[in-house]
Amino acid sequence: MALEIPKIEAILRGIAILLLVSTACLVGLDSQTKFVIVYEKEVTYKDLHALVVLVYVDAVAAAYNLLQLCRCSVSALSKGNFKGSYRYLSWACFVLDQLAAYTTFAAHSAALQHSVLGITGAKVFQWMKWCNRFTRFCFQIGGALTCGYIASVLMVMISFISAFNLFRLYSPKHFLRLKGT
């Protein structure tokens, strides 16, 4: 079981990287041009500020998971005893995994909320509905958000694994005392 956990973590990180990169690419490269009344209107991800934030957050989260995947590979190849520094590394990985999972989920939720305004519009603010005119743009953003939420769920699972890796170092009988001491 202990040998399978790093493999599962590496697989989850690899899939999360692919989903985060595909989300960033789908959102970042999405644009559509249509004639609206008498002028040509192009809609891109830059028109919705939450989508701009989403592209940056997904790119940073994918880079972080790539660095963690490299760390998993290096620690699997080296069979040294890193007990003293491993505790601090486990704490850092745990906190950063939690931060990455919560940040990506928050960015995807903000982008979803902003996208719902694009679907429904807001008469109070005189915002028009976009998705009845720019259907391909909306479908592509919807697919990207689906990929992003799946990546967020995978990152939550990764943070469960990093929590397990951290708290298995501590004694179950003594509060915050390492097992070896």
From Swiss-Prot:
<feature type="topological domain" description="Extracellular">
    <location>
        <begin position="120"/>
        <end position="140"/>
    </location>
</feature>
<comment type="similarity">
    <text>Belongs to the Casparian strip membrane proteins (CASP) family.</text>
</comment>
<keyword id="KW-0472">Membrane</keyword>
<feature type="topological domain" description="Cytoplasmic">
    <location>
        <begin position="162"/>
        <end position="181"/>
    </location>
</feature>
<comment type="subunit">
    <text>Homodimer and heterodimers.</text>
</comment>
<keyword id="KW-1133">Transmembrane helix</keyword>
<keyword id="KW-1003">Cell membrane</keyword>
<feature type="topological domain" description="Cytoplasmic">
    <location>
        <begin position="71"/>
        <end position="98"/>
    </location>
</feature>
<feature type="transmembrane region" description="Helical">
    <location>
        <begin position="99"/>
        <end position="119"/>
    </location>
</feature>
<feature type="topological domain" description="Cytoplasmic">
    <location>
        <begin position="1"/>
        <end position="7"/>
    </location>
</feature>
<keyword id="KW-0812">Transmembrane</keyword>
<dbReference type="InterPro" id="IPR006702">
    <property type="entry name" value="CASP_dom"/>
</dbReference>
<dbReference type="Pfam" id="PF04535">
    <property type="entry name" value="CASP_dom"/>
</dbReference>
<dbReference type="GO" id="GO:0005886">
    <property type="term" value="C:plasma membrane"/>
</dbReference>
<feature type="transmembrane region" description="Helical">
    <location>
        <begin position="8"/>
        <end position="28"/>
    </location>
</feature>
<dbReference type="InterPro" id="IPR006459">
    <property type="entry name" value="CASP/CASPL"/>
</dbReference>
<protein>
    <recommendedName>
        <fullName>CASP-like protein 2C1</fullName>
    </recommendedName>
</protein>
<feature type="transmembrane region" description="Helical">
    <location>
        <begin position="141"/>
        <end position="161"/>
    </location>
</feature>
<feature type="transmembrane region" description="Helical">
    <location>
        <begin position="50"/>
        <end position="70"/>
    </location>
</feature>
<feature type="topological domain" description="Extracellular">
    <location>
        <begin position="29"/>
        <end position="49"/>
    </location>
</feature>
